[in-house]
Design a protein with these regions (language model features):
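C-terminal anion-handling pockets and recognition modules
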Residues: 108-162
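Generic structural signal for small/hydrophobic residues in well-ordered secondary structure
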Residues: 31-32, 38, 77, 106, ...
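Acidic/histidine-rich, metal-coordinating catalytic segments
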Residues: 68-82, 106
Length: 162
């Protein structure tokens, strides 16, 4: 529950105060985005590891009907749970690993400012409250594919698809 602190506008000579509730509890948000359509797909997880990543991949493949006739390239970073030989990649999914230390190349990275927006400068009593706010925010983002496409459909994506 590390707080997300952002700058805000205040009157001159006013000191802004943001109450925080420092705790070390974690909640992981996975985001899948199709840059051309702006469609997103989300998972909230209590932690990340290879087993959960395998479950997320399997769910993603099933939800979108991946297989022999429907293929997708999934761009991921080189986190250990993404690149382990124990990762079970479902049929129809191909992982493409980004170079190290290059989050600016990952379209999904552009979504984090949107998901952090409703929790910025807020104090929450429980992880369940944070989870509820994030679920609502993810639903709002899912309803704005044109906006998401504008953020994530980098000009060079079309060149890669050719």
């Amino acid at each position: 529950m590390k707080p997300v602190i952002r700058r805000i506008w205040v009157d001159e000579w006013t000191v802004p105060i943001a109450q925080v509730n420092w705790r070390f509890q974690w909640l992981w948000l996975y985001a899948f985005v199709h840059p051309r359509s702006g469609q997103t797909y989300w998972w909230l997880l209590p932690y990340v590891n290879i087993q959960l990543f395998n479950k997320v991949l399997a769910d993603f493949a099933q939800h979108f009907g991946m297989g022999e006739r429907k293929q997708v390239i999934l761009v991921v970073d080189q986190a250990g749970w993404h690149s382990s030989p124990k990762v079970k990649i479902p049929p129809g999914i191909h992982l493409e690993f980004l170079p190290s230390h290059s989050p600016e190349l990952q379209p999904a990275e552009r979504l984090w400012t949107l998901t952090n927006e409703p929790i910025a400068n807020q104090s929450f009593e429980s992880l369940a409250q944070v989870e509820e706010v994030l679920i609502q925010r993810c639903r709002q983002i899912m309803d704005q594919p044109d906006f998401v496409r504008g953020l994530t459909n980098f000009s060079w994506w079309s060149e890669l698809a050719a």
